[in-house]
Amino acid sequence: MRRSYVLLAFAIVLIISIISAQVEADASSDAFADAVADAVADPIKGKKIMKNMGKAMKIAGKVAKAMAPIVVPLIVSAAGK
């Protein structure tokens, strides 16, 4: 009984995080389009913008790699039971 509450809470948190990530992805795609437009208009400023975006993508990749060993087994165990 207690385990089902934990899995339900985890599922709710996961759904909320997926929704917020989707909203953030929509906003970041708009920001990316603006950054590309700025890069085309001003190559010097654009190079700096693209460099910063590359750093942000590397950080996001590291976060995803760190979370995967924790999140994936939880999802698999929740789906299997």
UniProtKB/Swiss-Prot annotation:
Truncated sequences of this peptide have also been found in the venom. It is possible they have been cleaved in the venom. GO terms for biological process: defense response to bacterium. GO terms for molecular function: toxin activity. Pfam families: Pilosulin. Residues 22-43 form a propeptide. It is found in: Secreted. The keyword Secreted applies. Expressed by the venom gland. Residues 1-21 form the signal peptide. The modification Alanine amide is found at residue 79. Its main location: secreted. One of its GO terms (cellular component) is extracellular region. Keywords: Amidation, Antibiotic, Antimicrobial, Secreted, Signal, Toxin. Cationic amphipathic alpha-helical peptide with antimicrobial activities against E.coli (MIC=3.1), and S.aureus (MIC=3.1 uM). Also shows histamine-releasing activity (33.6% at 10 uM). Does not have activity against S.cerevisiae. Does not show hemolytic activity, even at 50 uM. Belongs to the formicidae venom precursor-01 superfamily. This is U-poneritoxin(01)-Om6a.
